Amino acid sequence: MKRVGLIGVIMAALLVISATPVMAGVSVKVSVNTTYPGELTVENFNLTPTYGRVPLTINITDVYLKNTNLTTPLSGTVYLYVNGQIKNNYYCSVTQTNNTTSWMSCGIEYTITDTSQTNISVGNKTDYLQNVTLTLWTTQLPESYVPQIPTLDLKDDGPISVDVLKIPSLKLSDDQVNVGETVTIEANWNYYAKEDGTRRIAVVSWADYRNIRSGATIDVATLLDKSKMTISLPEDGGSNSWDFTPTEPGYYVVVAFVDDTNFSDVLVFRATPTAAEKPTVSISVSKSVVALGDYIKVGASMSTDQAVKPIAVFITGANQTEVLCSYPEPGASTVGAWTVKEACGDDEWWIQIKDRPEGVYVAKIDVGEGELRAEATAVFQVVKPKILSLDVPSQHVKGQDLVITGTTNLAKSGTEDDSGSNAAENKAYLVIKDLSGKEVFNDTLSNQVYDSTGGKVKSNAVSLIDSDGSFKFKIDYFGKYFATETGFYIAEVKIQSDSLGEYTDTETATFEVVKPELKLIADKTTVTRGDTVTFTIDTNLKINSEVKFKIDDLAFCSGDPDCDVKEKTYYVDALGDVVIKLDVNTEAPLTDYKFTAEIPGLGISTDIRVSVVKQTLDISVDRTTVPRGGDIRVTGSSTADGVYIYASDSGVFTVGDTPVPDVDLKTKGSKINTTDVPYMEPDDNDNIDFQISVNVTGVETGTYYLYFYAPANISVVDKASDPQKIIAVTVTDPQIVEVTAPSKVPYQSKFEVSVLTDPGDRDNVEVRLVLSGPNVRDTTVADWASVDTNNYFNKTVDLRDIAKNKLNLDALEPGLYVLTAELRFKQSLGGEKVDSEDKLIEILGLTFEVDVNTPVVIGDEIVVNITTDRLEAGYDKIFVTLVGTNYKVTQVATLNSEGKATVTFETYGMSAGTYKVYVRDTMDTCSETDQYTWVDEHYMLDPASELAPMYKADDDVLVIKTIELLETAPTTTTVVTTTTAVTTTTVATTTTAVETTTTEAVTTTTEAQQGGGVPGFEAVFAIAGLLAVAYLLRRK
């Protein structure tokens, strides 16, 4: 790839810089004509070159003139000023046309030999353009550093291509912006395999970059660290743009790179201050509080748009000053520096804080002179080394590890904060003394004590300081070694912050060495044969410390592997505990047993007693009467390993999949065999909770006995010694508990039936409903179905559906019926009917009440109110037809839950006169599918007519009203109320259609019966049915 030697070029550029003229001084123009004073003025000029080696020849190439005389061209003389001093031998003569302003050629040449700051301007004999002064820096640069380009403007905004990175285009929106303005970076890139690296674009200040690039390589890690903005390009091709806003003046380099040798740093832009600005400086210290003897890091930085001198970095306070950097050296000739590192050789210093009093100190950077002077400070406090906390246990158990900790204000040992290097100077030291002052532990003794195996006892009397200022001492088995006597001791801790021991602090604490604690705990002190006892030896000993456990009588646990000898040695865990489990022998004598725990060598022991008693058994059942197929819940408690279940008969009960056997068949003498016998194991709290199922088939109703045993030996029940419990259980058939249904239901209506059962197991049974009555014999109205989770069977009985779909009738006659609920086992279990219950139901004749307002004034509504005893919300087979001269409208009346409906007719546009309202309930038996259309055509059809059976309209209810529609309101209003009680039968010979025409309030009640009364035979049947129902109810 192509690389530009940017470092050398920029160095020359920033040492020789020309500032663009700006209007920021006192004078804005200078007169250069004496004949017409003030009419010919110079207001600006151009200077070249703007860089070069000393000696440097400059040229005032042209000046900007203004002639305000309207008629006369004017001439004058322009003189050169250097550092505010006129150079009389350096001038040019100029002439400007009248009333014009323009640039005119001048051509003053002057050679600069001084390497210090030089101010160049032009003017007359007594004044010059201070406000357009140019600042020119020069230096003794080697010839090779002088760029071979027309100007020293290194700015480059592209576009460029970086072929090695497969970036066809990379450019900047501008090569010079003011601080706070935005530079946009635009890039187009092609595919670049990620295994070859990640392409990045970084924006970095020149002050940092000149130390990042060395020849043909760059330091990628430092570049990423110093980057002001870093962009990562994806593997696939693409394009994008990014904005960067410089916050400090200076040159910025845009570097595209993938590693230390594949990069491009051609793009450069400059950020200039919006006005003349002094340098930006900062200084920092590594910590705000530092102890005497420790080190502190001072870091300083400077950002500037021009080289600066002098530069000083120092620490001061308590009338003491320590200079870290002073630039330039006395007598040295220099133009200034751009960074602290350039001026001082470094920008970070590690300084040891010593030989100074406690107090607050200041680290300071001070740069520049006059109006360009800038400074910054950082404050830190110097304190004496101090132990901030000391944690010594008030009591220490003899033989345990002794741990002593604390904190200090010292830096971490072995860090630059400690010693300026990796040498560890900050340390803490421990000495332990008895009350007489004798040292029982120190740095020397810690290396001289050995245990019984010849190994050195681990301990430390010297501790390094951690990053949080903490220290730690640990002495293994203290009390067993070093201080072997119980009593009080003094721990003395000293800290030291330097290698010479000049800065120290000491703290002491008293603690007591005590004997260990020992407890022996049993989870049960009363046990049964076959039980398990858990013993816990609880100590405050160190892990792996030795304890002994003694069993007074091995008969307690004979057969247990941990019960082979009377005394055993154990070692404590990390909590200082030992856990021992012993199984009580199934034939252990019923007595007390003693157990002892001991710490060897210290004379510390404790004991506990455990009593062996008979097993316990406490059993209860949730019910003693249960249907076949039902379950009995057994709860209680037992100390036995298992509770075994027997019965007085085989084949009646089951536990899970195991049948409960006849106890007599398992008994031989006083022993009962437990093979193939169901049992339940108590939980960890000795509780039992299980179910015993009653079989469905092969079981007769009656009373049976259940036997429960809690044996000490699970292989055999000893009736003489093992606890037992006997419970009597009565087995019944599943039964119907209650049938809930209304005793009276409207004609052709729906009603709810609910059957509550005691099914035993609801999955075993099913229920159906059967209806009997006039012309109906054992008709199934609800097929066999299972009960729900609450043991209910719920069904909606639809009389209209039963008549039409099950009996092929138009309707069930009003009268008395018997609804029977039957309960049986499912067919898979034999289908045996086990219970039934009857419910007497009366189907009522339908009652109609129609109210119509009359007379009605045109403009008011005709309101038809219908009230029935049909409590079927949503029933919509009632039609209302309003008929008059050349007028007919039919509407549908829909009942609410109270059996009521209202229909209204608007009268606007109707003629005054007499109208009739026909209200028809088709009973939903009309033969026509479109009942609305049929009623609209046959609204007048009398249910008693010969044509009515053709349309199955002979069971209809028809009410006819006559109303008067008036032009104007009368003095009174007549309300017509008609109540029609309808008793219907399946054979209709007469139907009364009620027509009422009134001028007064009239109430008419008509019973329209579809037949000539109940025949004698049917009356006898009805009476016989009532007697039969009454008998059945008494039987239940």
Swiss-Prot record:
Main localisation: membrane
Subcellular location: Membrane
Keywords recorded for this protein, A-Z: Membrane, Signal, Transmembrane, Transmembrane helix
Membrane topology (UniProt): Single-pass membrane protein
Gene Ontology CC terms: membrane
Keyword Ribonucleoprotein attached: no
Parts of the chain that traverse the membrane: 1011-1033
Lineage: Archaea, Methanobacteriati, Methanobacteriota, Archaeoglobi, Archaeoglobales
Entry protein name: Uncharacterized protein AF_0946
Organism encoding this protein: Archaeoglobus fulgidus (strain ATCC 49558 / DSM 4304 / JCM 9628 / NBRC 100126 / VC-16)
Signal peptide region: 1-24
